[in-house]
Amino acid sequence: MLWRFLCVMQFYCLLAIYTYLGLTPHPENSVPVFNDLLMHFAGYSVAAMSISFARPTWPLWQRAAFLVVYSVAIEIGQYFNPPRTFSGMDIVANGGGVLLGLIVVILLEKTISPFAKLLYWNTQNHQNTGHNEG
C-alpha cells in the first residue's frame, strides 16, 4: 500500500514542480536554460514515465491525453503571465516527449519482468493478472 501511495505522490510532486516552473515569470533563476525544446521533450518523457507509475491501470491514451491537456493548460497560463509566452512548438515537443516516455514504459514492461511487477504492484491488475489491459 505504501508503494502505491509513493507512486501517486511522486507524480503529484512532479506536477507541482512543472506547474511552478511553467508559470513562474523567470524559471531560468531556478533551472539553468539549456535547449528549451529539448528540455520540454525530456521533461515530458519523464512525466510519461511518472504518470505510468502513478496510474498504471489507465489506458495509454488516457495517460497521454492527461499530459497533453496539462501541457496545453500550462502554455495557456503562460500567455497571461508576461514575460512568458504561448508556444505551439513547446506543445509539440511535450507531445513528442510523452510519446517517447510511454514507448519506453511499454518496452520495459514487455521485456523486463521485474519492471512490470514493480509498475503494477498493489493494483487490481497486479492482483488479478499482473498485466496492463490498456
Briefly describe each language-model feature range:
Residues 1-91, 95, 99-134:
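Bulky hydrophobic segments
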